[in-house]
From Swiss-Prot:
Binding site for GTP 1: 9-16, 56-60, 119-122
Name assigned to this protein: GTPase Der
NCBIfam families: GTPase_EngA (TIGR03594), small_GTP (TIGR00231)
PANTHER family named in the record: GTPASE DER (PTHR43834:SF6)
């Protein structure tokens, strides 16, 4: 089990910059905007041969009573509960702030091991940096620069020493970490993605706030359901330009697309109370282009009239007909209805994406399809399909060999896809078909 280090501090002291350095990633969005990190955000890091999990938190304001600031404070408190060691980050350039004292008072009461890190200390004498912060009563401050890396490795090494001293059992299996099936939950803003995550894992792990754009970053959550391991990827909602900060918008879209590429199965969440938009179709198109297994969840289904339900079904058939391979579930994430069936489809889609297709059966299905309907003649000769084998998985790829296959019509490719899907029960995954024309051994060479 890997030790857990939580990064805590008031807004804009450099928590996300330190998180990104520790995890060698750009997983946490970084910009000079207080409150940018709103959820607990997890990443993996390593110092020497010792791996650990880092938690980036939103700006901590313990006395906040309402609104999203209070939700961020709640997330930070949960991160502290999960952590073996807390690194409390303060700003060396701005000096000690009243809010730092409030946070220090809270942390002392938690019983967690606390390390005090004075960030943005590059170019400053240690005595000048540390003097202000001794009064917090948290021991000797560590002077660091998260942006440049100064002092960071020593700080984390000390945190790990504390963690292993506190819990020796951590050393027994530090590298054991089974992520299970990776599920990306994607969709436009405010369709219920975070509510679905919370329903699946049974705790308020991701803020589900009635405000579009609350979840700005991709968040990875390991959990088990019926004894099976999964990792949920809750992504920033894709949205039209102009509704959020431009820099964040561009990066969030990229993060969502990267999360789709990182997943085994994508759950596309649609809002039953809104029409299917071009944006929904674009997200769906990227999922298919990425070759990812897919399950569709139509959320907020409870309370809709029969007419409204018929309307959304017709809208889906018209605008998302290219997703006919995916199972559709009508759910209420808030009321937690339909989620069990959706997860069964996730398992089935993953199994279909990873299926092994024996060459003899593939070839037999191909020959039966050709016998039922031959491809149309193209030019002088009719295409001759000879045999098929599997060329890959996730998604499954069927490679068909033969002669004169360069002009196989798209309609015939779809016909073959349907035959293969039916024969192997491939529901929930895209299926790729590649045609390869055999070289004629009697053709004369120009050499």
């Amino acid at each position: 089990m890997k030790p857990v280090i939580a990064l805590v501090g008031r807004p804009n002291v450099g928590k996300s910059t330190l998180f990104n350095r520790l995890t060698r990633s750009r997983d946490a969005l970084v910009a000079d905007i207080p409150g940018l990190t709103r959820d607990r955000h997890y990443g993996e890091g390593r110092v020497g041969d010792r791996p650990f999990i880092a938690i980036d938190t939103g700006g901590f304001e313990p006395v906040a009573k309402e609104g999203i600031v209070a939700e961020m404070a709640k997330q930070t408190r949960q991160a502290v509960v999960e952590a073996d060691v807390v690194i409390f980050i303060v700003d060396g350039r701005l000096g000690l702030a009243p809010q730092d004292r409030v946070i220090a008072d809270y942390l002392r009461k938690t019983g967690r091991r606390i390390l005090l890190a004075v960030n943005k200390a590059e170019g400053m004498r240690y005595t000048a940096v540390a003097s202000d912060f001794y009064e917090l009563g948290l021991g000797d401050p560590a002077a660091i620069s998260a942006a440049h890396g100064d002092g960071v490795n020593d700080l984390v090494a000390e945190a790990l020493d504390l963690a292993f001293a506190e819990r020796p059992e951590l050393a027994e299996a530090a590298d054991a970490h089974d992520h299970g099936t990776r599920i990306a939950i994607v969709g436009r803003p405010n369709v219920g993605k975070s509510t679905l995550v919370n329903a699946l894992i049974g705790e308020e792990r991701v803020i589900a706030f009635d405000m579009p754009g609350t979840t700005r970053d991709a968040i990875y959550v390991d959990f088990e359901r019926n004894g099976k391991p999964y990792t949920l990827i809750d992504t920033a909602g894709l949205r039209k330009r102009g509704k959020v900060f431009e820099a964040i918008e561009k990066f969030s879209v990229v993060k969502t697309l990267q999360s789709i590429a990182d997943a085994n199965v994508v759950v596309l969440i649609l809002d039953a109370q809104q029409d299917i938009s071009d944006q929904d179709a674009h997200i769906a198109g990227f999922i298919v282009e990425s070759g990812r297994a897919l399950v569709i969840g139509v959320n907020k289904w409870d309370g809709l009239t029969g007419h409204a339900r018929d309307r959304i079904k017709h809208d889906m058939e018209r605008k998302l007909q290219f997703l006919s391979f995916a199972n559709v579930h009508y759910i209420s994430a808030k009321e937690r209805t339909g989620i069990g069936a959706l997860m069964k489809s996730v398992d089935a889609a993953y199994a279909a994406a990873m299926v092994k297709l024996p060459t003899p059966k593939l070839t037999r299905v191909l020959m039966e399809a050709v016998e039922y309907q031959q491809p149309r003649r193209a030019g002088v000769s009719r295409p001759k399909l000879r045999y098929a084998h599997q060329g890959g998985s996730n998604p499954p790829i069927v490679v068909i060999h033969g002669n004169a296959l360069s002009n196989i019509p798209e309609t015939y490719r779809r016909f073959l896809e349907g035959r293969f899907r039916e024969a192997f029960q491939l529901k929930g995954t895209p299926l790729r078909i590649e045609f390869r024309t055999n070289k004629n051994p009697y053709a004369q060479s120009n050499d």
